Amino acid sequence: MAISDKQFDAQFDKVANLVHYPWIGSGYASAPKRVLFMGHSHYAKDGKEFSQEEYDRNISDKEYTRGIISCAIEKGGWNFHKYLQKTFLYEDMKAHDFWSKIASYNFIQEPMKEVVANASQSCNEIAWKCFADVVQIIKPDICIFVGLKYDKGMNALDGENIRHFIKNFDIIINHSKPKFGELQFKDGYKLPFYMIHHTSMLYSPQLWHDFLNKEIPEVVSFLDK
C-alpha cells in the first residue's frame, strides 16, 4: 500500500525555485489536522567530504527528499527522522504510520556543502518564498520547524503581501528556547508554526513531546494514535 501521495505535484511544478517535491503522506490530505514538518537542508556529501556528483544528483532529482524519507522508513533512518518519530511515541517499526499522516520537506533549496555551514541570506529569502507558495497549495493547519535558525530572511515575505511574526518562548528545553510564529495570507489563510530544537542535536523526545502536547494537544493526540 502506498504511503505517499503525489496529487499536488502538478502544482508544485509551478512553484519558482522549488528544487524537490515535498513528501506528502497518503493520509495527509484527509487528516483531521494537517501537519507539516520542516527539515533544514540536504547535504552534498559522500561520507564526510563534499561530493560534486552528489550535489548534481541532489539538484536534478525532484524526488530526492521523498527518496530520503522512504529510505528512513524502510531502514530506520537518521537521527533527524528517528527522534522526530520518537517525539510522538513511534518506534522505528511504526515509522510508516507516522509518515503516512504528515507532510515534510527541507527548507533550504540548495544542498549544503558542509554540515556546519550557514545558508546565505539569499538562500533563506528564496526558502521563505517557496515555503509561502507550498503551504498555500497543501494548506497545513500547523507547521513544526525542526531547528531554530529559520527566521533569517523572513522579511522576504514583506514583498509578497504576507504578514508574519515570530517570538521566543521564555522557557528553555535542551538549552534552547522554542519559537512560535504565524503567517497571515491576504486570502485569510493563517498558518501558525513552532520551531523546536533540532532532533539530531542532543535532543530529548519526551521533553519536546510534553512541550508540544501543552501547546497543541489536538495535534499531538492525532500524531500519537
Identify the residue ranges that each predicted region occupies.
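A polyanion-binding, active-site-adjacent surface
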Residues: 2-138, 142, 148-152
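C-terminal capping/extension of enzyme domains
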Residues: 2-7, 12, 118-132, 152-225
